[in-house]
Amino acid sequence: MRSVEESYWWYQALRRHVVDSIRPQPETFSVLDAGCGSGGMLAKLRREFPRADLTGIDASEHAIELCRERNTGAQLLRAGVHELPFSAGAFDVVLSLDVWVNAGVDDALAAHETHRVLRPGGKLILNLAAFDFLRGAHDEAVGAVRRYTRPQVRALLEGAGFAVERLTYWNATLTPPIALVRWLSRRQLAQGEARSDFRPLPPFLNAALAGLAALELTASRHLSLPFGTSVFAVARKHG
């Protein structure tokens, strides 16, 4: 997965969404990637914001070891999103990218804990899988047990005390073909096969999909897309 994460168009698009949503910030600010995985997002943040104070946590020790290999200079800790080992108001920005969808995660508790560690006025950047009709073998393969709609995400965040600033679906262009692929994959799942959709693509196809995603990102800066395979939110802690 780490090798795919480096170049795969979807990860590239998500990282662009995140960086675009973090800006503007002062030259020095603090970021927590709560569920940092193998560290692809932390590496991107180090390139984009060289003086940022980066921290990553993950429940997997293997993920933390992979992060260390990237030499991002981030503080790395093994921890879960239910009990973040930081004081209240410790961070300017918290990222949670496709973590709350996972088995064993209480999304409401994670939202409240994220709110606690943000400073007043701090920003949460959140990405979650969208729409139950897009559930397929990919979800089973990556351990995702829930998908969300925009109203559900708004209710979740506002219930934790956040003010929602931006809430949009994304990857709208590819939703119809992905829906078909996921429907077919549910038949495979019935036969006991569960494989992630994220596999290496021919370079020309990967580049074309990255281009489509970049165009959509430009559009989503000015409007909220009505559907997509993921829902993306930016929310602030009052203060």
Which positions does each model-derived feature cover?
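Conserved catalytic loop of SAM-dependent methyltransferase domains
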Residues: 40-41, 166-206, 210, 226-230
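C-terminal lobe and adjacent flexible extensions of AdoMet/dcAdoMet transferase-like proteins
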Residues: 213-239
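Conserved alpha-helix/loop element of class I SAM-dependent methyltransferases that forms part
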Residues: 10-29, 44
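A short acidic, Gly/Pro-enriched loop at the edge of an enzyme's catalytic core
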Residues: 82-93
